[in-house]
Design a protein with these regions (language model features):
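Central hydrophobic cores of alpha-helical transmembrane segments
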Residues: 21-28, 190-201, 213-220
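Junction motif at the cytosolic side of a transmembrane helix
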Residues: 243-263
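Short hydrophobic, aromatic-rich alpha-helical segments embedded in or entering the lipid bilayer
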Residues: 209-229
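Transmembrane helix boundary and interhelical loop/hinge segments in multi-pass membrane proteins
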Residues: 80-102, 106-107
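Aromatic- and glycine-rich beta-strand/loop motifs that create alpha-glucan
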Residues: 1-27
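Residues that define the loop-to-transmembrane-helix transition and helix capping
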Residues: 16-19, 107, 188-189
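Helix-capping/transition residues at the boundaries of transmembrane alpha-helices
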Residues: 11, 88, 99-101, 177, ...
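Secretory targeting signals
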Residues: 18, 22-86, 110-184, 203, ...
Length: 263
C-alpha cells in the first residue's frame, strides 16, 4: 500500500496539477476573505447569498477564521474535481490494468490512492487557512474590526475547530468526487455532474423550496465547513453528510472490486 501511496503522490505533486490547484484554492480564498472585509458596510452584503456579516461577528474569538470557513465549500469543490479526475483517468488512460498487475489487491489500490489524495487536500487546506487568516489580519484595520480576541486561547481554539471542520468538509467533497470517478469512469462526466449538481441544481431546488437544502449533500458538506448555519445545525449536517459519503463510498467500492477494469 505504501508503494501505491507514493505512486499516486508522484502524480499529485506534478507542478501543473499541484500549482494549478493551489492557485485556484488561493484565488477563491483571497477573493472571499477580501470581500468579507472590504464590503463590510455594503448594502449588497459581504458574504454568500448577499448575507451581511457585521463587525460584531468578526470581532469575536473566531473572527479570524470566518473568511476561511466561508470558502470551505469552494475548496471542497476543487477537491472534488481533483479526486474525480485522478480516479477516473485510470480508466480513461488504461493505467488501472497496469496497477493491478503490480498490485492485485483492488482495495489496497483504492485505499492507497485515497490516502495520497487526502494528504494533498490537507496541504491545500492548511495553506488556504494561513493565507485567509493573514489577509483577515491585514484587512481588519481598514475595516475597523478589532482583533483583540483573535489570538487569545479562545481564538486559537476557534481557529483549530474551523481548520478541523473545513478539513472534514474538503475530504468529504473529495470522496464524493472519487465515488463519481469510480461510478462514471470518465473525468469529464464525473467533474461536470458533480459541479453541476452542487453549484446549480441544489441552488435551483433551494430557490424553489428552501427546505430542500436541509437534505442536499452539497449543502450539508458546505455547512460542515462553516460549523453550522442559521438554517442547518452542525450535528445535522455532519450526520447526514457522513451518511451520504459512507453510502456512496460503499457502493463505489463494491463496484470497483467486482467490475471489469476496462472503460
Amino acid at each position: 500500500m505504501i508503494r501505491v501511496i507514493f505512486a499516486e503522490w508522484r502524480k499529485l505533486r506534478r507542478p501543473t496539477l499541484f500549482l494549478g490547484t493551489l492557485g485556484a484554492a488561493l484565488f477563491f480564498t483571497g477573493l472571499t476573505t477580501t470581500f468579507l472585509y472590504l464590503m463590510i458596510d455594503s448594502e449588497q452584503g459581504n458574504s454568500d447569498r448577499g448575507r451581511q456579516v457585521g463587525r460584531e461577528v468578526l470581532q469575536l474569538a473566531g473572527g479570524s477564521a470566518y473568511g476561511f470557513a466561508s470558502v470551505g465549500g469552494l475548496l471542497g469543490i476543487i477537491a472534488l474535481c481533483v479526486f474525480a479526475a485522478q480516479t477516473a483517468q485510470e480508466y480513461t488512460y488504461g493505467t488501472l490494468r497496469n496497477l493491478l498487475v503490480r498490485q492485485p489487491g483492488r482495495i489496497r489500490i483504492l485505499i492507497g490512492k485515497l490516502i495520497a489524495m487526502k494528504i494533498f487536500a490537507l496541504i491545500l487546506v492548511v495553506i488556504a487557512a494561513v493565507v485567509s487568516i493573514s489577509l483577515s489580519y491585514l484587512l481588519s484595520d481598514r475595516a475597523k474590526v478589532s482583533t483583540d480576541l483573535w489570538f487569545t486561547s479562545d481564538g486559537f481554539h476557534e481557529i483549530g475547530k474551523t481548520l478541523l471542520n473545513v478539513a472534514i468538509s474538503v475530504i468529504y467533497f473529495g470522496i464524493v468526487g472519487m465515488v463519481l470517478g469510480l461510478l462514471l469512469r470518465s473525468p469529464i462526466s464525473a467533474i461536470s455532474i458533480g459541479v453541476l449538481w452542487i453549484l446549480i441544481i441544489e441552488n435551483l431546488l433551494g430557490a424553489v423550496k428552501p427546505v430542500f437544502l436541509d437534505w442536499m449533500p452539497g449543502s450539508q458538506l458546505t455547512t460542515i465547513a462553516q460549523g453550522g448555519s442559521a438554517d442547518i445545525s452542525y450535528s445535522h449536517a455532519l450526520t447526514l453528510g457522513t451518511s451520504y459519503v459512507f453510502i456512496g463510498a460503499v457502493i463505489a467500492t463494491v463496484l470497483f472490486v467486482r467490475r471489469d477494469v476496462a472503460n
